[in-house]
């Protein structure tokens, strides 16, 4: 596939033209961002569907933990910088400074991932195969970290369509290669290794084709790189703790229950992110617009969009709950080739938690736009401590139901804390003005 795409003749020029040109940039931005975000969100879902049909429930449980762990460390790589980069309308930092900082954080991501795997393997007595799957999943996600800096830059240049096309094509082809590997090799580790090498080469090709169109004569100032890392540290800490909070039940299940139960929890937790995903389709293109509104003190329009977004989250949550009540268990059981009838209540509880997850994500974005992001780490820190203390208690006593209820309670607490911080931030900004 790579050889066909990267043909130095006509095919390469066609691909370059496709990536860089859109008849209607705004329309293409929405469509391709939606497609790419959906594929990114459902990447694990599709992979799990193939695993449950080609391998077994144990392998699905290993994948669920590996994917959750890799995504946790991906937050170190991305450093919570995407929304800050896109909303940097004053161009406080240039792209080379964003990219240099991303290389630093990605190296840190790799180091921390390896340390975690060594500790977790020793503590939980992982098999060698499980250990290597987690390591390669972390390497697989490093590509997402590097790519995100370029996608953020293209979005900053009002070319979200280019970013969306890159992400969509890479996701489709990577999932295809991983799936074919599982079907023909029946080996999760080998399939993951092949997919990792493939997606790395794919990213290199896409960046080579697109970046020259946006390249500017810029220099990297070391002082500004460290300043960027300092400014975004609260965002990173918030993103890291947020992901830990959302996945704390999975880590407790890994320590206390079986890999098969881990797989079942992962199956019913999948729809949780649908709410945030659907909300992201609508809200992501609005970030730069709302940032400009805030900068130009168009408060009425700013708050109108804010309340519209809250309403949208509520509607999406209600629709998803209704759909899950009627079709959730049959559809998920069919998708994952597993009987999930005993987990219907847990599914509904988790989906409600997903609504509060989306709401907290909106609050986080608004706090970043109005530049009170330092407060986020405090809120996440409080809830993360609660998650660390309560996760083993809930899971040990109530198993999967305990994990589901705990998730909902943590999301509600997070929303309450952020709502208070946001209101204080608005009042402070008004008084400063």
Regions found by a protein language model. Name each.
Residues 25-40, 66, 72-120, 128, ...:
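Membrane-water interface segments that mark the loop-to-transmembrane alpha-helix transition
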Residues 24-79, 110, 175, 233-260, ...:
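Signature of the first transmembrane helix
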Residues 29-44, 48, 169-170, 192-207, ...:
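Transmembrane helical elements of multi-pass membrane transporters/channels
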Residues 130-138, 165-213, 231, 269-272, ...:
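Hydrophobic alpha-helical transmembrane segments
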Residues 74-93, 156, 272-297, 368-369:
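Helix-loop junctions and terminal segments of transmembrane helices
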Residues 58-60, 119-137, 259, 325-355:
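Interfacial segments at transmembrane-helix termini and the short loops linking adjacent helices
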Residues 23, 27, 83-94, 142-168, ...:
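Membrane-interface junctions at transmembrane-helix termini in multi-pass inner-membrane proteins
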Residues 3-5, 9-26, 161, 165, ...:
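Interhelical loop/hinge segments that connect adjacent transmembrane helices in multipass membrane
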